[in-house]
A protein has these predicted regions:
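Conserved ABC ATPase signature
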Residues: 139-143, 147, 382-386, 390
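Catalytic Walker B motif of ABC-type/P-loop ATPase nucleotide-binding domains
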Residues: 164-167, 407-410
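H-loop/switch region of ABC-family ATPase nucleotide-binding domains
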Residues: 199-200, 442-443
Length: 484
């Protein structure tokens, strides 16, 4: 039993950041509860209250009571919380203690003093459940974002805690691993574990979760069962920042005629040090000035293709009409929003991030871009003080400010609610209207339906399918996301 009784919390040094206001919530043992709501509504703060990170790590002004099995969590020793509660953070990289997957999977058991034979058995069973055998023996630095997310989920599962707290666990997962995650959550539920999931993607949880608790500005808006959620008006849910509970209802937006010009990629072959070739694209073309969705499973080399396209990795050539662009030219004309935006935010304020991205810094134009993405109030904030979804939008704002000809966005809607996903979709459409070619590496089917016009499907470093999105092909796209 987890009880949150009239709790309010404000982070130290920032009274507006992730505040929870007079929140009361009771979660009986064995329930699966989804915390939902728009970015910055307080979901992550609630998870930190439940796992003791507040106030042990995140300091601030806390009132009210948080109890786990009748005990005040603020008075429980950390080792006891760690034994009973497993947490997966919004950014899995921030919870890794090792440099390789095997050590990370066994670390929690070693830390709790389990015998070696038991550790080996627990890791083996967890690896089998998560179907991550191919990730064993690998460097964490060489994994894709989705692969890191699976290792993070598996590493906390190894100790079999009674309470599992997951913060955006599907944000970087492909459709296959979302299905695996859903089955694991079902298994936890059958075992009587209490599972709390902070999530924007709701469709994979509607047949598992007991309750959906929606927050807005740190307060509870509703507490509904899955059946009650499905009966809600979609416009009402969208206004609260919620994604669709049923992706079968999605329809593509009417697409205009594709342009006659093409972008062609030749000899895009690449391998990381001491590894076999992961990208093997000999020759393929896509229409120019379109929004192109790059889809495929985690580890398919989608991000590697994006890095090669931008010239970050030295591979192949791109032809745009009569122009041949080698990697040095592509570095000048391409802009990439990385999968982990923490790698590319390094100034003292959000405004400065946009200004250094511009050829000719223009504060008024920067303010207009921030307003377009709902970031005006954060102009003077330090980027690292923002939530994961807010950082994501700042990185997208820098892409708009850069005015480059070719834009690559790697999981641009990771951790974003419905409202902000739509804002990103509008920005991508704006880039298209300005004559830019946009490549979107994504697992977000809702984003694809809102703005993308063409699909390139990559698996094992090769293009296995490509097509324009229209009424004749949208079932092909939808079935890929439903049937994996």
């Amino acid at each position: 039993m987890i009880e949150i009784e009239n709790v309010s919390f404000y982070y130290q040094g920032n009274e507006q950041m992730g505040a929870v206001n007079h929140l009361s919530l009771s979660i009986p043992k064995g329930q699966v509860v989804v915390l939902c709501g728009e970015s910055g509504c307080g979901k992550t703060t609630v998870t930190r209250l439940m796992n003791g990170l507040i106030p042990n790590f995140y300091k601030g002004d806390l009132t009210g009571a948080v109890r786990v099995n009748g005990r005040d969590i603020t008075k429980m020793p950390l080792y006891e919380i760690a034994e009973n509660t497993g947490s997966v953070f919004q950014n899995p990289r921030s919870q890794f203690f090792n440099v390789d997957t095997d050590s990370e999977l066994s670390f929690a058991c070693e830390n709790l003093g389990y015998p070696k034979d038991e550790i080996v058995a627990r890791v083996r069973e967890t690896v089998k459940d998560f179907k991550i055998e191919r990730l064993l023996g690998k460097s964490l630095f060489h994994l894709s974002g989705g692969e890191k997310q699976m290792i993070a989920c598996a590493s906390v599962c190894v100790t079999a805690p009674d309470v599992m707290i997951l913060d955006e666990p599907s944000s970087n997962l492909d459709v296959r691993h979302i299905s695996i995650l859903a089955k694991i959550i079902q298994k936890w539920k059958a075992q009587g574990k209490t599972v709390i999931i902070s999530e924007h993607r709701l469709y994979y949880l509607t047949h598992i979760a007991d309750r959906f608790v929606c927050l807005a500005k740190g307060k509870k808006v509703f507490d509904l069962s899955a059946d009650e959620l499905r009966k809600q008006d979609m416009e009402k849910l969208s206004a609260l920042g919620l994604r669709t509970p049923d992706i079968r209802c999605l329809e593509p937006e009417p697409a205009g005629a594709a342009g006659k010009q093409s972008l062609c990629f030749e000899k895009f072959r690449f391998s990381y040090k001491r590894q076999k070739e992961c990208l093997q694209l000999e020759n393929f073309c896509v229409p120019k000035n379109e929004i192109i969705a790059i889809i495929g499973n985690n580890g398919a080399a989608k991000s590697t293709f994006g890095r090669c396209l931008c010239g970050i990795e030295k591979a192949g050539m791109m032809r745009d009409g009569d122009m041949t662009l080698l990697y040095k030219e592509r570095l000048k004309q391409c802009y990439m929003v990385m999968q982990d935006v923490n790698h590319q935010l390094f100034t003292e304020s959000v405004m400065d991030e946009l200004l250094i991205s511009m050829k000719n810094p223009d504060e008024q134009q920067a303010l207009e871009i921030l307003a377009q993405l709902g970031l005006s109030e954060y102009a003077k904030r330090h980027p690292m003080s923002l939530s994961g979804g807010e950082k994501q939008r700042v990185a997208i704002a820098t892409a708009l400010a850069s005015d480059r000809e070719y834009v690559v966005m790697d999981e641009p809607t990771s951790g974003l609610d419905y409202k902000h996903m739509k804002e990103v979709a509008l920005c991508l459409k704006q880039l298209k209207e300005l004559g830019k070619s946009v490549f979107v590496i994504t697992h977000d089917v809702e984003l694809i339906y809102h703005c993308c016009t063409y699909v390139v499907h990559i698996e094992a470093g090769k293009v296995i399918n490509q097509y324009a999105i229209d009424k004749s092909t949208h079932t092909l796209l939808r079935d890929y996301f439903l049937l994996q």
